[in-house]
A protein has these predicted regions:
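A general structural signal for well-ordered alpha-helical segments in protein cores
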Residues: 1, 5, 33, 67, ...
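Conserved, mostly hydrophobic/aromatic
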Residues: 8, 40, 70, 108, ...
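C-terminal alpha-helical cap/extension of soluble enzyme domains
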Residues: 147, 151, 158-244
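An acidic, carboxylate-rich microenvironment
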Residues: 32, 62, 117, 175-176, ...
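Active-site beta->alpha loop and helix N-cap motifs at the rims of alpha/beta catalytic domains
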Residues: 1-90
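Short helix-capping segments at alpha-helix termini
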Residues: 11-19, 43-44, 74-76, 101-104, ...
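Catalytic alpha/beta core domains of metabolic enzymes, predominantly
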Residues: 72-73, 84-192
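Generic secondary-structure boundary/loop-capping signal
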Residues: 52, 80, 88, 102, ...
């Protein structure tokens, strides 16, 4: 918990409290997740981002009871995190609709990787329930389909571009949004060519925004081949910014 406190305090300082901060929590035990909610109840955050219990693959009925129990217990609103390729269980749309009725469940980070499921939920979700895509390479499609925004690794590197894509789509300027998207879609693929966050850390380190590309085992730093590709893409983007 001490390490988590340090990370959160750093983030709160960096955001200067102008941006909402959601604390990510995960675990396979409802009881222990409640303890984590108690431990963080007085932290100066705005909400929680909570994924499904991993590894144990509970039923949909179990997922509803799990998240409702956490929402009843939490001091801050919860954003569901549906990422079945990491947790091994998918929150179905019927389950999501049931959970969306809880007043303390505010939205979802959608990484179901099934566009048909995502569109179906967007069309059926209750008013005020926010959907944020977390699939970097599918950002343009998700925003075009009606997602409210995104939580993206790639946006750490190209924040203004990703923000402009959302703004342009909301203004009905699809062609301009597509042009902006085409300028970053290759980057989204590079950043996930090897397990994240190693590629992004390499990029930020090369830009001297962080002190080291080091990651903790079992994660490892990027391969020499990917480092070469990342460095080349960084140089290409730097050249684009030079005056003609």
């Amino acid at each position: 918990l001490e390490g988590l406190v340090s990370v959160v305090l750093d983030e709160l300082s960096a955001s200067s409290r102008h941006l909402p901060v959601c604390l990510g929590l995960s675990g396979a035990s409802t009881a222990r997740m409640k303890e984590a909610l108690d431990d963080t109840a007085d932290w100066p955050i705005n909400g929680y981002l909570i994924a499904s219990p991993y590894y144990i693959r509970p039923s949909q009925r179990g997922l509803v009871q799990h998240f409702n129990a956490l929402a009843d217990h939490a001091s801050w609103p919860i954003v569901l995190y549906n990422i079945p390729y990491r947790t091994a269980v998918n929150l179905t749309n019927e389950t999501l609709l049931a959970l969306a009725e809880h007043p303390n469940i505010a939205g979802m980070k959608d990484c179901c990787a099934d566009r048909a499921q995502s569109i179906d939920f967007l069309n059926r979700r209750p008013a005020g329930f926010r959907v944020l895509t977390g699939e970097d390479a599918q950002t343009f499609d998700a925003l075009s389909d009606g997602a409210d925004g995104a939580i993206l690794l790639s946006a750490h590197l190209e924040t203004d571009t990703f923000a402009s894509i959302r703004t342009l789509l909301r203004q009905g300027k699809r062609d301009l949004a597509l042009t902006a998207w085409q300028s970053v879609v290759g980057l989204t693929r590079l950043l996930f060519a090897e397990p994240s966050p190693a590629p992004a850390k390499h990029w930020l380190w090369r830009q001297r925004l962080i002190d080291s590309p080091e990651v903790r085992l079992p994660m490892v730093e990027v391969s020499e081949d990917l480092a070469t590709w990342l460095d080349a893409e960084m140089e290409r983007r730097a050249q684009l910014l030079l005056p003609a």
